[in-house]
């Protein structure tokens, strides 16, 4: 399928929203499995499906509100993103994050105050979970899109956002309003030649700054963010 946009020219818009398993703190798929084939690892919070235990009932597929558990009709097992846990165990970022040419994906632990995830989620509050109203406490966070300025009927720049804020609230909840204000203010600081820790973090000139997953002991959950 070809990409399509929303809105009317010249203010039409589209953006990409990478989707992966959220490795939720309260995964609905885990609760739905009658044979306890789905489990959450204590050491990093990654949610996995035990392929030996899975009986292919597919209750987990229907339970996940993000539709991120699929059924393998060949193996007759439910499967999902494993967050590349063998790589994480070796201190290497998941393949989707490490190979991203746009340097858009950050990987780290929420409990690591010096890591990128904690700064984006807690310090700057610009990284938000998708559909927080589902109540599963997802551990993948998104920095909302900041698109070019829109135009008014006379073809002049308008203060109206190109992506309707109402739509972003639908995706990321009410916290997106303040996140957009913060992002806009920090972008203006950077344009004016002033320092901005947030913009430097998101620009990620050093790719290693995207990842901070080694030598961290946690018990609740890992986190990922995409900008």
Q: Residues of each region from the PLM?
A:
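Extracytoplasmic Gram-positive cell-surface binding/anchoring modules and repeats
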Residues: 22-24
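Short strand-loop junctions, especially beta-strand C-caps/beta-turns
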Residues: 52, 84-86
